[in-house]
């Protein structure tokens, strides 16, 4: 994986004492923020008791994501009693139950990835559909949150500006990995 510096920055910012840590990856659309979040989650999955993915494109997508997270929690942690009693059709209740589970005193090692937070509620954003991410974070100040956004104005944690790849070898490494063509970085590629 290319972007080793960014991966190291994310890891350092999210490593801590059990209190909530938040990293915001911001940059142009298509620059690689989501792929960076995926790479971080894969690389550090053993550091977390659970990893959740929320699509923050709009409120409907977000609430559907919370329903999927609730089902994941019930599969992986069947003793989550509040979640087992929630009607999955009532998405506001599901969201509250997930936030309550995340806020349990012993539950400090989860990672929540908030992807596509591109319409944030800000003083400069007058869109009525804009989302306030803080409404969807647990009230307890614990766990890790990784946000991807196009907005450089989302200031809820450690900001990392994701830019285009500066080193052509990093670009070739990504191309090699995604195309399953070995050796692109050293000039030897198999023609398939």
Model-derived segments and spans:
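A conserved switch/coupling segment of P-loop NTPase cores
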Residues: 5-20, 27-28, 38-49, 59, ...
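Conserved NTP-binding/hydrolysis module of P-loop NTPases
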Residues: 59-83
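Amphipathic alpha-helical "lid/sensor" segments that cap RecA-like P-loop NTPase cores
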Residues: 190-192
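Conserved beta-strand segments of the P-loop GTPase G domain that flank and frequently precede/overlap
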Residues: 53-55
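Conserved lysine of the Walker
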Residues: 33
């Amino acid at each position: 994986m290319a972007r080793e510096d960014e991966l190291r920055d994310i890891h350092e910012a999210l490593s801590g004492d059990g209190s909530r840590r938040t990293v915001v990856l911001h940059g142009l659309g298509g620059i690689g923020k989501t792929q960076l979040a995926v790479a971080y989650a894969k690389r550090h999955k053993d550091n977390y008791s659970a990893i959740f993915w929320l699509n923050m494109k709009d409120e409907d997508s977000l609430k559907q994501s919370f329903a999927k997270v609730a089902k994941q929690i019930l599969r992986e942690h069947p003793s989550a009693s509040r979640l087992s009693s929630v009607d999955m059709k009532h998405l506001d209740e599901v969201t509250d139950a997930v936030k309550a589970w995340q806020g349990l005193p012993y539950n400090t090692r989860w990672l929540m990835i908030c992807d596509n937070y591109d319409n944030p509620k800000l003083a400069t954003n007058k869109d009525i559909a804009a989302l306030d991410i803080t409404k969807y974070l647990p009230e307890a100040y614990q766990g890790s949150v990784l946000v991807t956004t196009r907005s450089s104005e989302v200031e809820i944690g450690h900001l990392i500006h994701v830019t285009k790849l500066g080193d052509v070898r990093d670009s070739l490494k990504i191309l090699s990995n995604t195309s399953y063509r070995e050796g692109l970085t050293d000039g030897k590629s198999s023609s398939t």
